[in-house]
Curated annotation (Swiss-Prot):
The lineage of its organism: Bacteria, Bacillati, Bacillota, Bacilli, Bacillales. GO terms for molecular function: DNA binding; DNA-binding transcription factor activity. Disruption phenotype: Deletion of the gene induces changes of proteins involved in cellular processes depending on iron availability. In iron-rich medium, mutants overproduce a red pigment after entry into the stationary growth phase. One of its GO terms (biological process) is negative regulation of DNA-templated transcription. It comes from Bacillus subtilis (strain 168). PANTHER family: HTH-TYPE TRANSCRIPTIONAL REGULATOR PCHR (PTHR35790:SF4). InterPro entries: HTH_MarR-typ (IPR000835), Metal_resp_HTH_trans_reg (IPR052067), Tscrpt_reg_MarR-type_CS (IPR023187), WH-like_DNA-bd_sf (IPR036388), WH_DNA-bd_sf (IPR036390). Induction: Up-regulated in response to iron starvation. Negatively autoregulated. Also repressed by CcpA in stationary growth phase. This is HTH-type transcriptional regulator PchR. Residues 64-87 bind DNA. The gene is pchR. Homodimer. Represses the expression of the yvmC-cypX operon, which is involved in pulcherriminic acid biosynthesis. Also negatively regulates yvmA, yvnB and its own expression. Positively regulates yisI expression. Acts by binding specifically to a 14-bp palindromic motif, the YvmB box, which is present in the promoter region of the target genes. Residues 10-153 form the HTH marR-type domain.
Length: 169
């Protein structure tokens, strides 16, 4: 691969990162709009809280450590978010009868509405993404998959060991 091609790939990668940041900023507004159309009055104020609700809805019963592991968040961050979600009545905490040490979470009716709306929006995005992928051949899709797997592994390794700029293998 030529240096020019590598530079073009890198430039597009940086552009993709910037677009992703911009998209993240508009996703919450889009969620608010959809919620209003569905008559969902109360909504968490950030996407991380919405994703915690989603994680709880997908994995009930789940505890703080489970949410932290599945979402790659610190336990302290999950505690802060879950405390707020309990106060806002999106989730409840409880203990299992056979385990009084662990605190588990489940969705309230209000939280279930957020979960359902979030699932609906994700399904729409997933379908659109699959339609986009259909424009590529099987071989191209395999190359994209390999690239994304290796890039994700590299970025995850950077986060866990703090080593920036590791080359992709």
């Amino acid at each position: 691969m030529s240096d020019l091609t590598k530079q073009m790939i890198y430039d597009i990668y940086v552009r993709l990162l910037h677009l992703n940041e911009q998209k993240a900023n508009t996703s919450l507004q889009q969620f608010f709009k959809e919620a209003a159309e569905e008559d969902v009055a109360e909504i968490p104020k950030n996407m991380t809280s919405i994703h915690v609700i989603d994680c709880i809805g997908q994995h009930e019963p789940i505890n703080n450590a489970g949410i932290a592991r599945k979402m790659n968040l610190s336990k302290a961050n999950v505690t802060k978010i879950s405390t707020k979600l309990i106060k806002e009545e999106f989730i409840n905490s409880y203990q299992l009868t056979d385990n009084k040490k662990e605190v588990y979470f489940k969705l309230t009716r209000k939280g279930r509405r957020i979960f359902d709306l979030h699932e609906k929006l994700h399904k729409k995005k997933e379908l659109a993404f699959y339609q986009f992928l259909d424009s590529f051949s099987q071989e191209e899709q395999k190359a994209v998959l390999k690239f994304l797997e290796q890039l994700t592994s590299t970025l995850e390794a950077e986060q866990t060991d703090g080593t920036p700029d590791k080359p992709v293998k």
